[in-house]
Amino acid sequence: CQACQEYMGLGIIVGKSGQGKTHALKKYAELPRVAYIECDDTMACRDLVEAIENGIGLPKGYGGTIWSRVNRIREFFNTNEGFLLIIDEADKLINKYTQKKMEILRGIFDQSNVGIVIAGEPRLETELKGNLARFANRMDFYYKLKGLSKNEVVDYLEGYEVDEAAMGEMISRATNTQSGCFRLLDRTLNNVLRILKQKGETRITMKIVSEASNMMML
């Protein structure tokens, strides 16, 4: 993200669901001159343009055609250099019938002084290489998430009182290659903290983790 913002580059981040893409991107988006857009399957071209307008703070109510609104977005980025536009869940913008929404993003990048990061599940990379060569060959930066390491889990739980057995279970939930991911770790921790609050306790034990697990669909 930092490289794309600094050098006005185009980057892609891919990773499986639950590996922490959205969490990390939202954290970065707290920095100045960063606009974060989260996409979904129902978005039309006009919805994408409106989301970008809202993300960069353009006044509402201008209306106009998609072309004219995209031009205003380009003008904004050319006037306000140093911005990064993050498009999360970008794989949801592509289907077998149309790639128009990705072409809108390509047009903004080509004609604006702005860095763009698109992020999504692994099929995003496949779709770009197979069906959107004009987008793929513009990529300056690429990063593929590999999941959390043991040390990263320990760092994430820093500040909490966790016994050895509970720590081992939390590490497994985050790093297990079959079902482990950041989302499972985060959900487990949130439930653990709820239980601790109810009990008036502070120490995370294996018993508490088991109670938290009973509240979840695993």
Stretches found by the model and what they are:
Residues 9, 80-85, 111-119:
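Loop/turn-to-beta-strand initiation segments
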Residues 89, 118-123:
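A short beta-strand-to-loop transition that corresponds to the Sensor-1 phosphate-sensing loop
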